[in-house]
Structure formats: C-alpha cells, structure tokens
Design a protein with these regions (language model features):
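Exposed beta-strand face motif in extracellular beta-rich ectodomains
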Residues: 2-6
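Short glycine/acidic-enriched loop and turn motifs that connect beta-strands
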Residues: 43-47, 94-104, 152-154, 191, ...
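Conserved structural position at the C-terminal beta-strand
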Residues: 10-12
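C-terminal edge beta-strand
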Residues: 19-30
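Loop/turn-rich, solvent-exposed surfaces of beta-rich toroidal or solenoidal domains
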Residues: 264-286, 292, 297-339
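Conserved beta-propeller blade signature
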Residues: 36-40, 87-91, 144-147, 183-186, ...
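Repeated scaffold domains used in trafficking and secretory/extracellular systems
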Residues: 71-83, 129-142, 170-182, 209-219, ...
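A short beta-strand motif characteristic of beta-propeller blades
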Residues: 60-73, 117-128, 160-168, 199-207, ...
Length: 352
C-alpha cells in the first residue's frame, strides 16, 4: 500500500537498544482508491495525539496511517479533515500544547499531506496561535483556508502564513462547513454565512427561518440544509442564489444536531441519512418526501452502547459508516466501526 517503513528493534546483553529503519515501497494504489475511507481519531487531550485510520474496499484497516507514512504524529485532539486538489488538510484543537499547557510531540495544529500517499507536505502551528479551539476546516485553495473556532471563522493564507478573523462570522456553530459554487457555507443559528475567496468579511447570509442543524453539498452542486425543531425540515438550496429550491417536512425524527460536531445528515444522490447519535438509522427520500427507519445497529452488536459522532455515507459506494463505542470512562477505548449497506428496505452489515 504505497510507501512505508520497516522497523527492526533489538536489545543487546548490556541493555542498549538498536533500531534499524528501512523505507519500503509496495506496489498498489496507496490511498488513492476512491472506494477507500479515511476516519479521523481525535485521540485524547491528556494522553495522546490524534490519528488517521484508513479502511480499504475489502475492509482491511490500517491504524495510524499518517504516522506510518511519516514517522510523526498529527496534532493533539484532531477535529476535522478536508481534501482538496489531492491535498489533505487536518486541523486539531490543541496543536502541540493541550488546554492545560502540556506539550505534545506532533506536527502541529494544521497538517497538510498528499491525500494519495499521506506524505506530509506542510505543517502550521505558531501561525495559528490566535485560534481558540478550532473545530472545522474547509478549503478553496492554498490561500483560502477557512477554519472555524470559538471566535468565528478565520481565513488562513498558507502561502503567506497569515490568519485573519472574518468580520461577521462570530457565532458560527461547531458544525461542519460545506463548499459549493466556489464558496464556503457556515452555520450560525438560523442563517448560513456565505464566505468567499480573499474576503475577510461575510459576503452574505441566507436566513432559513429555523435553527439549522447541518449543511452539506448535494451531488448537483447545490446544498442540503437540515433544520431541527417541530416540524423538522430538509431543504435543497441553490448554492448560487441562496434561494430554496424545495423544502420537505420531516415528522419521523427531529433532525437535531445534538452533541455531535460532524454533519448530522449525510447524502447519497437524493437520499439523506440520519441517526441523531442514536443506534437507529433513518433514510429520507427527498424526491418522494418519505422517511424510513432502516434498522437498529444494536442488532449487529449490542455491546457497543453509544454512537460517537454522526454517521457518514460513502459518495461512491453509498455505504453507511457508523462509529460505536462501549461507553465513557475507559470503555471509550473499545469501539466498532460499522460499514452498512442500504438494501432498500433495511440494513446489511458489510464490515465491522
């Protein structure tokens, strides 16, 4: 699977440790297979850095994929990942120093790597020292990297190393941003903030009239917007004009974003999936307006009691990915990642 390292370590009779490292190349597609999946682990604020998992189309798992390819680690409490132009941008909450001042040996707050080899291309830490617990990232190009934190959304020019807080972005929610029509869309209450290249002020706002839970790019280049409340709604919004194309009322679930920081809806063509951090997975067919409960993941593994962050659907295979943990305390170390197939009237487990 691409480029890696072979390590041989031994100890002599005097207790001295010897380590030999060889870089090796294995014929294959590396991490470029579009059927593969990356999963970002935040790690733990007090004990370990974040890490990246890669799962290939056969369900084989490579833990610590970034560390394997670089010999170094991602930042402390990694939060979000965005891939643009064969580059992977990974933002962490704490970078090299956690919230209580403990230092960590890692590559910093923002890491840029080749998305097909995972080889590190650039790292940033001091340049982003003004950020306060960053959580999400979206990228238009190297000079227009948008990072959401507790202050709002910042524009970062990685070529110049300059970060600027975007005026009018205060209150941007701890939720995934979407990129469509060459713009970034961030959530702030009932409004979408429209962020544009090179602009340090919010370009315009789109008022949906109801608390927004999630925004995601549709396969036709427009936007999916879910709204929580009673009734809950899902709308398709024109990414060029900001006008609603169609809005469906959803009565079966409330579409609440909950405590998850990811995108609470996930789309495959005109079908949208939602779990609400629970074990049941729902499908909303936007064309027909019908919502169906596909199944309960507890039927596959009852030992895992909590869904940790929202589900995600693979844009090519249509398979649904859900992460479940055994519980809090040290039980968070015991987890299962489910790969599921929508059979039309239920769920089929592909890999666990």
């Amino acid at each position: 699977m691409g480029l890696g390292e072979l390590r041989l370590q031994g100890t002599d009779e005097n207790g001295l440790v010897y380590l030999a490292i060889a870089r090796v190349s294995v014929k294959g597609s590396g991490f470029a297979d579009p059927a593969g999946v990356f999963i970002l682990n935040e790690g733990n604020m007090t004990t370990e850095n974040g890490s990246l998992i890669y799962i290939d189309k056969e369900g084989k798992v490579l833990d610590y994929a970034y560390r394997t390819m670089n010999g170094t680690e991602l930042g402390n409490v990694t939060q979000d990942i965005y891939i643009f132009n064969k580059k992977m941008y990974i933002i962490s909450q704490n970078g090299k120093t956690n919230a209580v001042g403990t230092g960590f040996d890692n590559d910093g707050m923002l890491v840029v790597a080749n998305s097909e080899t995972l080889v590190k291309e650039a790292t940033f830490n001091e340049e982003l020292s003004a950020l306060n617990w960053p959580t999400h990232i979206a990228v238009l190009d190297e000079k227009n990297i948008f990072i959401r934190d507790n202050y709002g959304v910042h524009l970062f020019d990685s070529e110049a190393g300059i970060e600027t807080l975007i005026e009018g972005s205060k209150g941007a929610g701890k939720l995934t941003m979407a990129v469509a029509d060459g713009k970034v869309f961030a959530i702030a209450g009932s409004k979408l903030l429209v962020l544009e290249k090179g602009k340090t002020t919010v370009g315009k706002t789109i008022d949906m009239g109801q608390q927004i839970a999630a925004v995601a790019k549709a396969n036709d280049g427009n936007l999916w917007v879910s709204m929580q409340g009673s009734p809950a709604k899902i709308a398709k919004v024109n990414s060029k004009t900001g006008e609603s194309i169609k809005t469906n009322v959803v009565t079966e679930v409330n579409l609440n974003a909950g405590a998850g920081a990811g995108c609470s809806i996930t789309a495959y063509q005109n079908k949208l999936y939602y779990s609400g951090l629970g074990s049941k997975i729902y499908r909303h067919d936007f064309e027909t307006g019908t919502t169906t409960m596909l199944g309960d993941v507890k039927e596959f593994n009852s030992e895992m009691t909590m869904t940790y962050n929202p589900i995600a659907v693979h844009p090519i295979t249509g398979h649904i990915y859900m992460n479940r943990i055994k519980g809090y305390g040290w039980n968070f170390l015991i987890n299962s990642i489910f790969e599921l197939e929508d059979t039309g009237n239920g769920l089929k487990i592909v890999h666990e």
